[in-house]
């Protein structure tokens, strides 16, 4: 892996994305209610940071679930806030403790009567009650399975961090698909649309091509956008930028360029597979609606990444215009956490 430069140019992912962005009309009302719900538990030690990240995540929901009705959108906001609780609890835990936290989350998600008396179990039960009211049985089962895969992979990420180990690319892709929570968020699409797909639909080659392309596009875009924030915190091991630099002996700029080419291929695969599904009679129309809805995630995530200050802080408009990222030293990021700005910390 070559020495890291102090700046790099992001790939222009908007230029390869023909999908149209939109926002949810229920955003302000539902986001405020969801935020009040999670804050009523008083579990965040840094309220300013919690408020910003929650608001930022709810803004993301507005883009990626633009088509959701009020109740469904509110439930989606609740879920991203629940994930924030899980992350907040497990962020500084070792692998063993992170697995224990994950088990609480999964057990409460699978069983409405399971209770260890923890706040996490109570919050999870309250989300689950809203979710299962409208979700189909197959969707509920898959969602619980994905919750378990997510927490297992988050714990594995913690173990890799303890060992200062960076995975090879193929192993990393498999891990990143799960610990990013993108698949969990995609599972909410069935709930929103009021559909309950058979497991066989996910095994269809054309459906799977679109599904995994949409997942990888979001994961890889997030990694290149978040790299500066993560390197300033000293947490770069769970990022495809680092994986590419190490495995392929690339510079930071070369890794960014590589990601741009891969994202272009992922977008092309998604669009081609979606077009084939539209012309096919092999799968139910609900499967096509599901794949089309994933497009909101692909474009909405791009728009949100520069609309919010999550990754680039107060420089987000400049970075959007120039694509140039100046790497921040850790002291600068720490100072921004203590300032009055809305920079992510």
UniProtKB/Swiss-Prot annotation:
Binds 3 Mg(2+) ions per subunit. InterPro entries: Isoprenoid_synthase_dom_sf, Terpene_cyclase-like_2. A motif (DDXXD motif) lies at residues 87-91. Gene3D superfamilies: Farnesyl Diphosphate Synthase. GO terms for molecular function: metal ion binding; terpene synthase activity. Its cofactor is Mg(2+). It is an enzyme of class 4 (lyase). Mg(2+) 3 binds at residues 222, 226, 230. Keywords: Lyase, Magnesium, Metal-binding. Its EC number is 4.2.3.91, 4.2.3.129, 4.2.3.127, 4.2.3.128. Pfam families: Terpene_syn_C_2 (PF19086). Sesquiterpene synthase that catalyzes the cyclization of farnesyl diphosphate (FPP) into multiple products, including germacrene D, beta-copaene, beta-cubebene, (+)-sativene and cubebol, a natural sesquiterpene alcohol used in the food industry for its cooling and refreshing taste. Terpenoid hydrocarbons resulting from cyclization of farnesyl diphosphate are intermediates in the biosynthesis of biologically active compounds such as antibiotics, toxins and pheromones. This is Linoleate 10R-lipoxygenase COP4. It comes from Coprinopsis cinerea (strain Okayama-7 / 130 / ATCC MYA-4618 / FGSC 9003) (Inky cap fungus). The gene is COP4.
């Amino acid at each position: 892996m070559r020495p890291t430069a102090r700046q790099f140019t992001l790939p222009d992912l908007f230029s390869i994305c023909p999908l149209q962005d939109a926002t949810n009309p229920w955003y302000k009302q539902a986001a405020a209610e969801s935020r009040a719900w999670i804050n009523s538990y008083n579990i965040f030690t840094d309220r300013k940071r919690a408020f910003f990240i929650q608001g930022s995540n709810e803004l993301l929901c507005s883009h990626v679930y633009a088509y959701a009705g009020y109740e469904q959108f509110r439930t989606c906001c609740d879920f991203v806030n629940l994930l924030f609780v899980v992350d907040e609890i497990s962020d500084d835990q070792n692998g063993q403790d992170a697995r224990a936290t994950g088990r609480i989350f999964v057990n409460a998600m699978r069983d409405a009567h399971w209770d260890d008396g923890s706040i996490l179990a109570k919050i999870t039960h309250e989300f689950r009650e809203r979710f299962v009211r409208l979700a189909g049985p197959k969707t509920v089962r898959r969602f619980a399975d994905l919750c378990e895969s997510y927490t297992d992979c988050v714990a594995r990420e913690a173990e890799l961090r303890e060992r200062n180990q960076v995975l090879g690319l193929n192993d990393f892709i498999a891990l990143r698909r799960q610990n990013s929570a993108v698949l969990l968020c995609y599972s909410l699409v069935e709930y929103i649309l009021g559909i309950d797909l058979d497991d066989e639909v996910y095994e269809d080659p054309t459906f799977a091509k679109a599904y995994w392309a949409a997942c990888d596009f979001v994961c890889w875009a997030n990694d290149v956008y978040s790299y500066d924030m993560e390197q300033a915190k000293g947490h770069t091991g769970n990022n495809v930028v680092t994986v590419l630099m190490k495995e392929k002996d690339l510079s930071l700029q070369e890794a960014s360029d590589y990601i741009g080419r891969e994202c272009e291929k992922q977008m092309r695969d998604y669009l081609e597979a979606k077009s084939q599904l539209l012309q096919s009679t092999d799968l139910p129309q609900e499967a096509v609606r599901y794949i089309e809805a994933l497009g909101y995630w692909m474009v909405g995530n791009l728009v949100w990444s520069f609309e919010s200050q999550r990754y680039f802080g107060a420089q987000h408009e400049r970075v959007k215009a120039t694509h140039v990222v100046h790497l921040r030293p850790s002291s600068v990021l720490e100072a921004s956490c203590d300032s009055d700005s809305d920079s992510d910390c």
